[in-house]
From Swiss-Prot:
<keyword id="KW-0293">Fruiting body</keyword>
<dbReference type="Pfam" id="PF00337">
    <property type="entry name" value="Gal-bind_lectin"/>
</dbReference>
<comment type="subunit">
    <text>Homotetramer. Oligomerization is required for carbohydrate binding.</text>
</comment>
<comment type="function">
    <text>Binds complex carbohydrates, such as chitooligosaccharides. Does not bind lactose. May play a role in fruiting body formation.</text>
</comment>
<keyword id="KW-0134">Cell wall</keyword>
<dbReference type="InterPro" id="IPR013320">
    <property type="entry name" value="ConA-like_dom_sf"/>
</dbReference>
<feature type="binding site">
    <location>
        <position position="73"/>
    </location>
    <ligand>
        <name>a carbohydrate</name>
    </ligand>
</feature>
<feature type="binding site">
    <location>
        <position position="64"/>
    </location>
    <ligand>
        <name>a carbohydrate</name>
    </ligand>
</feature>
<feature type="domain" description="Galectin">
    <location>
        <begin position="9"/>
        <end position="154"/>
    </location>
</feature>
<protein>
    <recommendedName>
        <fullName>Galectin-3</fullName>
    </recommendedName>
</protein>
<keyword id="KW-0964">Secreted</keyword>
<feature type="binding site">
    <location>
        <position position="81"/>
    </location>
    <ligand>
        <name>a carbohydrate</name>
    </ligand>
</feature>
<dbReference type="InterPro" id="IPR001079">
    <property type="entry name" value="Galectin_CRD"/>
</dbReference>
<dbReference type="GO" id="GO:0005576">
    <property type="term" value="C:extracellular region"/>
</dbReference>
<keyword id="KW-0272">Extracellular matrix</keyword>
<feature type="binding site">
    <location>
        <position position="45"/>
    </location>
    <ligand>
        <name>a carbohydrate</name>
    </ligand>
</feature>
<dbReference type="GO" id="GO:0030246">
    <property type="term" value="F:carbohydrate binding"/>
</dbReference>
Amino acid sequence: MFHILRLESTVDLSEPLKDNGIIVFQSDKLDLEPSPNLGPTGIDNTNVNLINAKGDVLLHIGIRRRENAFVFNSIPYGESRGPEERIPLEGTFGDRRDPSITIFDHPDRYQIMIDYKTVYYYKKRLEGRCEKVSYKINEGQTPPFSDVLGVTVLYFANVMPRAN
């Protein structure tokens, strides 16, 4: 299934993500220069999130250009964030003008790929299936991606050739 996800919005998936599902966020722009305006938070942060039916953020992927970091976390609904896990941002996207973030939902972890190359495995902290995705930015900042992302949900069983 394909969905359009606008900056500062949340979209319901057509159905909850099934076991071994894959979500691909695609942009037609990449700007890795830090946002000139840090706004009230003081942190250059754009993020995409996988959210369950209860409103828990199962996986938060923050792009913090000024800190040269991808930040991974989980956020139980109405509670504080857990400890951040980080990897360097520099060099992950290469020269691509159509960047993508792909998340493969394994039973115990998320495999995170940037431009279809695995960069991190994030151990699941919260239960539930992804039913929504969001694309957010801190107030007053410019995003590294286009204002609209394409979101594709797929499964290996549907894309792998099968022998007869």
